[in-house]
């Protein structure tokens, strides 16, 4: 059986790229495809075998301006020739669910998220755009949104990275999905002897992460906040940061995990589809102070969780329910009032339920019937 692994693009490092990397490790004989590829961001195991990219790769600086190439996505995706493959496994938060396969082939899509800027995040993205860009984006979005819905019907079986995403797949595409949480390298996590006096924020510095709320809260409380990550928001965030805020940039794995391990807690303000960063923090036994919506509801056991009874010794964090500095400040103070009651060992054990080995085992089980017999899956199977 010939197999292809298809990822939306390798233009940054994040949870989606980690999933694609694990897929490549699971299936070393599979060929790898992507819409666009920046060699700097291709995982080592994938770069050794090579990636076949779409014709968009020939556009100068395409990996930097890929969002502006939205009108070309449908054509670029459909020009990738996957007819030789019996099983196509896509890792997608973009347009790759629309690849064309043979009628007798099986297409399984591991969906990190429907495209936010086409669906639930459309108006938020539109508001941030210059006036001259709004009309072209609106016209292109209408066309690509229609295509994206049609493309989703080509998939034989969806796997969602969280219950939250499964709900959005159902709402926007009318498709059922199996839920399989993405892989976390929990073995990298370790327990520090004692935390140091700082809070941590980690991730790409982009608008929806709402890092500015964390900065404002820590400015007003006078708490130390260390920020790991780079992105287009960095200049704006630096401009609003007070003396207790420190920007660490991009860290190597060793330094990143050490920074997790010695933080008092992780601060997380985004409404994420899943969110690997909170689990990486918990793999080091550190609590999470998170926005109580989206994927965080599935990865953090909060003491103040609505509709869920969490004992003090089982808690792994605290939620705030409004994306405001005031709500974050209140959550930080609530955490500090009970900080000594958290069990680093219990927090770490909670994170290990999401380990890479668990993901690989379940993924192999999901794919096994189709690998063995090329049986086209039924919806929700």
Positions of the model-derived regions?
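Conserved acidic donor-binding segment of nucleotide-sugar-dependent glycosyltransferases
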Residues: 301-325, 334-340
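Short hydrophobic beta-strand element within catalytic cores of glycosyltransferases
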Residues: 287-292, 297-301
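Nucleotide-activated donor-binding/catalytic signature segment of Leloir-type glycosyltransferases, i.e.
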Residues: 234-254
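A charged, aromatic-enriched C-terminal amphipathic alpha-helix characteristic of glycosyltransferases
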Residues: 323-326, 337-369
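Membrane-proximal helix-turn-helix segments that form the acceptor-binding/catalytic region
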Residues: 127-158, 166
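Active-site donor-binding segments of glycosyltransferases and PAPS-dependent sulfotransferases
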Residues: 26-97
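Acidic donor-binding loop of glycosyltransferase active sites
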Residues: 261-273, 286-287
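Conserved donor-binding/catalytic core segment of Leloir-type glycosyltransferases
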Residues: 184, 190-226
């Amino acid at each position: 059986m010939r197999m292809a692994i298809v990822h939306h693009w390798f233009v940054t490092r994040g949870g989606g790229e980690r999933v694609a990397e694990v897929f490549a490790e699971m299936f070393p004989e599979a060929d790898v495809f992507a819409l666009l590829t920046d060699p700097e961001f291709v995982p080592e195991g994938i770069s050794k075998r090579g990636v076949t990219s779409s014709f968009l790769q020939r556009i100068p600086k395409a990996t930097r301006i890929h969002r502006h190439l939205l009108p070309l996505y449908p054509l670029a995706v459909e020009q990738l020739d996957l007819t030789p493959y019996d099983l196509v496994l896509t890792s997608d938060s973009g347009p790759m669910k629309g690849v064309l396969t043979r009628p007798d082939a099986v297409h399984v899509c591991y969906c990190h998220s429907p495209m936010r800027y086409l669906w639930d995040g459309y108006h938020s993205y539109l508001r941030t755009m210059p006036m001259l860009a709004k009309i072209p984006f609106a016209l292109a979005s209408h066309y690509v949104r229609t295509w994206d819905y049609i493309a989703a019907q080509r998939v034989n079986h969806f796997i969602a990275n969280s219950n939250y995403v499964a709900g959005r797949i159902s709402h926007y595409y009318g498709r059922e999905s199996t839920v399989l949480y993405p892989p976390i390298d929990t073995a990298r996590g370790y327990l520090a002897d004692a935390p140091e006096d700082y809070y941590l924020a980690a991730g790409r510095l982009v608008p929806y992460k709402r890092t500015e709320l964390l900065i404002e809260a820590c400015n007003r409380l006078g708490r130390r906040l260390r920020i790991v990550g780079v992105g287009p928001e960095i200049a704006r965030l630096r401009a609003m940061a007070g003396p207790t805020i420190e920007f660490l940039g991009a860290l190597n794995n060793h330094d990143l995990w050490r920074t997790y391990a010695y933080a008092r807690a992780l601060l997380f303000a985004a409404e994420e589809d899943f969110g690997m960063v909170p689990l990486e923090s918990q793999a080091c036994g550190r609590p999470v102070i998170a926005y109580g919506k989206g994927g965080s509801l599935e990865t953090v056991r909060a003491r103040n969780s609505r509709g869920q009874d969490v004992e003090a010794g089982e808690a792994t964090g605290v939620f705030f329910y409004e994306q405001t500095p005031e709500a974050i400040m209140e959550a930080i103070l609530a955490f500090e009032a009970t900080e000594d009651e958290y069990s680093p060992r219990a927090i770490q054990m909670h994170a290990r339920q999401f380990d890479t080995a668990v993901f690989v085992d379940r993924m192999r089980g999901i794919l096994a019937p189709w690998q063995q017999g090329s049986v086209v899956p039924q919806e929700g199977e």
